[in-house]
């Protein structure tokens, strides 16, 4: 049994610095690097790619909506053409830094509202998948398990990775509980570890209404901006190794 452990990183920009990227990267197998629209800038992107390479961590693009103020977590009324173009733009930006450090972009995971829009809307998911395929058909598209991001990526011929979350609660339909709700984020370490093991070993998660939901767990996400990110990543890695589960990049 194997699983990938990923984290959204490189989300500082300018004078705004947060997250424990230097401590987290050695513990994960895949880094989703912000590409400048929701967070990150040219200096942070360069440093994050360099750091990932130093620790043999797979580099992935983490493109988001153009919303620095809202950290890319607010829905924006945006056309399909704009979605396609912002995907290509951000992938190109990251590719530049990957090229100078002689590493390859391994995967793409949309961020925040863009991720949720793609998970719930087949047409948006199709646009996202097509953009990734047109940029590089060898890339892995990471999306919410059982969502349109996964099905539409498969439809265009992309390799997919179904993502599950250690630090988020689930609805009965397998969607994530909205961050607008007070119970959306898991902050208790034991609860997070219990959820992770059930998802990885049984391909199931218990929803907020105590319903058992079936899902595929190819990669586990911990949000890098979360208060408990470093602790969660450390403990998840520890318990997976204890259970004999291989932690490997996508």
UniProtKB/Swiss-Prot annotation:
Keyword Metal-binding listed: no
GO molecular function: 5-oxoprolinase (ATP-hydrolyzing) activity; ATP binding
CDD domains assigned to the protein according to its UniProt record, in alphabetical order: LamB_YcsF_like
Similarity section: Belongs to the LamB/PxpA family.
Entry function: Catalyzes the cleavage of 5-oxoproline to form L-glutamate coupled to the hydrolysis of ATP to ADP and inorganic phosphate.
HAMAP family: PxpA
Name of the molecule in the record: 5-oxoprolinase subunit A
Organism: Staphylococcus aureus (strain MSSA476)
């Amino acid at each position: 049994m194997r699983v990938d452990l990923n984290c959204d990183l490189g989300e500082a920009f300018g004078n705004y610095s947060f997250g424990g990227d230097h401590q987290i990267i050695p513990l994960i197998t895949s880094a989703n690097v912000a590409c400048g629209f929701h967070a990150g800038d040219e200096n942070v992107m360069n440093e994050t790619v360099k750091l990932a390479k130093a620790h043999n961590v797979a580099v992935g693009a983490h493109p988001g909506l153009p919303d620095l103020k809202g950290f890319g977590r607010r829905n924006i009324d945006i056309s399909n053409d704009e979605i396609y173009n912002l995907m290509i733009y951000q992938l190109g930006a990251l590719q530049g830094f990957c090229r100078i450090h002689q590493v390859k972009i391994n995967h793409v995971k949309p961020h925040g509202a863009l991720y949720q829009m793609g998970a719930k809307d087949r047409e948006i998911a199709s646009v996202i998948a097509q953009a990734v395929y047109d940029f590089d058909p060898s890339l892995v598209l990471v999306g919410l398990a059982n969502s349109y991001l996964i099905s539409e990526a498969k439809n265009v011929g992309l390799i997919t990775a179904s993502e599950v979350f250690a630090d988020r609660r689930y609805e009965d339909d397998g969607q994530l509980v909205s961050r607008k709700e007070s119970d959306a984020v898991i902050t208790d370490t034991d609860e997070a570890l219990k959820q992770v093991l059930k998802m990885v070993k049984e391909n199931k998660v218990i929803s907020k209404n105590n319903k058992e939901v079936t899902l595929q767990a190819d990669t586990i996400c911990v949000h890098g901006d979360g208060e408990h990110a470093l602790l969660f990543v450390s403990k998840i890695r520890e318990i997976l190794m204890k259970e004999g589960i291989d932690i490997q990049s996508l």
